[in-house]
Amino acid sequence: MDRHANMGVLIDEGTLAQTRITLAELLRNEPSSDKIFELVQQLVQEQPADLSDQLDQLTGTWELRWSSSSQPWLKQSPGLLNLQILDPNQGRGRNILQLGGPLGQFAGIQVDADISVVSQQRVNVCFKRGGWAGPTVAGRKLQLLRSIEQSFPAWLDITVLDDALRICRGNAGTIFALVKRPEIRLPDWTL
């Protein structure tokens, strides 16, 4: 009986691994696929994140590839790059929305936040400043940012996490699916 129970676990782990691979491929190549929501729901139920063991996996630059929102800036678009940088060890986060292609460095919106991991899945977010962010010229980052007075609590519940994929739910209930962009390094938070 134990042998069969172990086989079931192996089959389930294999199925979960294939589901993750399929979802990651769809997010990269077909982000408007109708199959994404079903795969997201399956992974959230069967493979919950645990930030007490996965904090290093959370750290890095993530690209939004799908969301349950109808807002255009929260939808994947070929001409728009939507990044989220999380550095929980430094307590910092950054959202970047910019045009794709070579002009993207001149037309970006940046929102900086303080973040803190408060449970096995929850990351509290306190937005601090936001505005236009341009290129770095002569070692100086060109930007025009204003302070933000956040009047509501914000958080992300990280529901699925591995080295390449993150699924989370925001405080407004929106579900996000992001892929890791390891080639985009963490920023110098002092600039």
Per-region residue spans from a language model:
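Soluble ligand-binding/transfer domains with enclosed cavities or grooves
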Residues: 2-191
